[in-house]
């Protein structure tokens, strides 16, 4: 029997077996300071669902993490990763968030770094459209939740057993969550829970794959082509003025202050816009926000929460009135401050032009307002606009 035709298969099989047997420590060195710098605005799954890049991020003092959701990937020249520079900030912004990254997704992501968070400064952007009738959907949970981050969260030595137990209980509410037996055991009796959330062998393979994908990432940053709209040493007032100019030029097709490109999509759909499931003051999302805030306080992180508004003119038009929105805004605010967080509340600006770029995404002038508070928070400057915790 001739082996030559089978050599490629045999070689591939041998390489695969060797890969399985090699320790993850041989690969983690692929993720270094340059990898972190290269991924500041990448918003890839290796950043958002992995642990290696975020491990390095929190070992460094060069970066200021900004957590949120889909607004972080919008091509706006006033996005903090574009607008903040050495003239107005003392650290580089690092973006973490994508569509579907709501409170629980971000809470687990942050909790997986719990032991590194003490004294670390970061901003967490809260979007009002998260607070729906159903909260985090099963679909978004399946797409955005990370097994390796859950596993690393349960390995955090300084995180209390009670906090971990609360996460186990919440995770069990999702039908497709991995390793329900482990979570059930931890939720019932943490001290008797053995093994780990994922096996050592599986963890080893996932970390190796993550390291390789981080090194050879092919996806381009959604902000790669975006350039600053003002000179590097522009004042905040100059930036706001320019933001208004750009916002005005980008919203000529409608009376709602919605970006022309997005307005065209609304017109083309020819369907009545229904958002009745949003702005629910009894949304389960509030419990996830409370868990996140309590986790960050227990970890000793210096978090600036930012509550952004919606487009008030548009939401009035589609039947979700100011009173309903204000009730949710107020509860977001109280959930943060009553649980030990400080908040920059922008929700009084939901009728201000060029703060929101479509229905819900912050843009233009809204970003500049936030950029200024982020820069102040970075540098430890006074922030009279920020409400402090009540306890």
UniProtKB/Swiss-Prot annotation:
The organism of origin for this protein: Staphylococcus aureus (strain NCTC 8325 / PS 47)
Pathway annotation: Cell wall biogenesis; lipoteichoic acid biosynthesis
PANTHER family registered for this protein in UniProt: PROTEIN DLTD (PTHR40039:SF1)
UniProt keyword annotation of Transmembrane present: yes
UniProt subcellular location: Cell membrane
Segments on the Extracellular face: 27-391
InterPro entries, per database record: DltD (IPR006998), LTA_DltD (IPR023896)
Chain ranges on the Cytoplasmic side, renumbered to this chain: 1-5
Keyword line: Cell membrane, Membrane, Signal-anchor, Transmembrane, Transmembrane helix
Organism phylogeny: Bacteria, Bacillati, Bacillota, Bacilli, Bacillales
Protein name: Protein DltD
Gene giving rise to this polypeptide: dltD
């Amino acid at each position: 029997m001739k082996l030559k035709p089978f050599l490629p298969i045999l070689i591939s099989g041998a390489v695969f077996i060797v890969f399985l047997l090699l320790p993850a420590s041989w690969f983690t060195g692929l993720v270094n300071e340059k990898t972190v710098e290269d991924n500041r605005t990448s918003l890839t799954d290796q950043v958002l669902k992995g642990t290696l890049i975020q491990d390095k991020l929190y070992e460094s003092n060069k970066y200021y993490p900004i957590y949120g959701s889909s607004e972080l990937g919008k091509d706006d020249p006033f996005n903090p990763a574009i607008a903040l520079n050495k003239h107005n900030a003392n650290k580089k912004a690092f973006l973490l968030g994508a569509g579907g990254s709501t409170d629980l997704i971000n809470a687990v992501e942050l909790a997986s770094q719990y032991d590194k968070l003490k004294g670390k400064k970061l901003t967490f952007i809260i979007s009002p459209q998260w607070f729906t009738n159903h909260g985090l959907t099963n679909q978004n949970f399946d797409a955005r939740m990370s097994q390796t981050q859950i596993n690393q969260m349960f390995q955090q030595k300084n995180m209390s057993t009670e906090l971990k137990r609360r996460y186990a209980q919440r995770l069990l509410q999702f039908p497709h969550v991995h390793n329900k037996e482990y979570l059930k055991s931890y939720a019932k009796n943490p001290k008797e829970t053995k093994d780990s959330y994922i096996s050592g062998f599986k963890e080893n393979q996932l970390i190796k794959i993550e390291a390789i994908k981080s090194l050879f990432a092919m996806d381009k940053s959604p902000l790669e082509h975006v350039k600053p709209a003002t000179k590097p040493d522009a004042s905040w007032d100059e930036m706001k003025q320019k933001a208004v100019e750009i916002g005005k030029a980008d919203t000529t097709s409608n009376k709602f202050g919605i970006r022309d490109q997005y307005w065209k999509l609304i017109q083309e759909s020819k369907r009545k816009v229904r958002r009745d499931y949003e702005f629910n003051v009894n949304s389960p999302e509030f419990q996830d926000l409370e868990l996140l805030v309590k986790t960050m306080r227990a970890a000793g992180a210096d978090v600036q929460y930012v509550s952004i508004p919606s487009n008030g003119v548009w939401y009035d038009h589609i039947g979700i009135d100011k009173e309903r929105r204000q009730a949710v805004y107020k509860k977001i605010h109280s959930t943060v401050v009553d649980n030990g967080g400080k908040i920059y509340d922008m929700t009084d600006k939901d009728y201000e032009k060029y703060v929101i770029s479509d229905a819900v995404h912050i843009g233009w002038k809204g970003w500049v307002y936030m950029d200024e508070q982020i820069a102040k928070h970075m540098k430890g400057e006074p922030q009279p606009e920020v409400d402090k915790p009540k306890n």
